[in-house]
């Protein structure tokens, strides 16, 4: 495992425990922080990788790699289709399409904890100049708003987003007034599904009865207005683009804004258990899964492995 300039918080629990771990970083304090290192290299990441390329040997094309390229392309197409879908109730994906559309080349994303975290990972079209921050290992709900304040204070000339679910937003919404008081033009986006969605997902996975997950419907646009910033409610597809255009206009004028998007409480597709493979599941179970998650065009990895003759 080559761990380059990363602070990925789940390295200890998600990587194989016996994997050879090589870490490159220019900060000595983080070497070995997330995982025991076999080789720790204190150096510039870019220069190190360039040197690795010079010293390394070209690898031969492999069927395994080709199968995974096809698999990733299929997954990306699924996400793109969901962001463009307008024939269902309002979901979170079209909002991310708008966020991607208006994002500046060096935008900063402060991502809260919950379904919004995994949705951001899947749907934000980030480039190498667009950092995003969250509370990974501790999963501290409510981190999005203070993170956006810190980002805007640190980088006043860069576009900053706060992306949060309604559960997290309700915990810290009083600090919208801090953005107003200090003239911090942040684009706040609240995904309101009237539930602690990620906890609901976990309870479903563990076969628990629903407990403690329902949230009262909150008018976050009115909350924002009450604290001195413009609040916009979106509950229809055709309201999405004008809302984000208005957000750009306001923040360019030096004013923060909040967009409250009223979405369905439909679960994001659980990639840890994709029920697609006919060799593992019966057809009805597969059909039910595809219908629930609009995954008619998703193909199991096993199909691509067969296509490329991977044994």
Segment roles from a protein language model:
Residues 113-117, 193-195, 262-267:
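Glycine-rich beta-alpha junction loops
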Residues 1-67, 203, 244-247:
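Glycine-rich, acidic loop regions that bind phosphate or pyrophosphate groups
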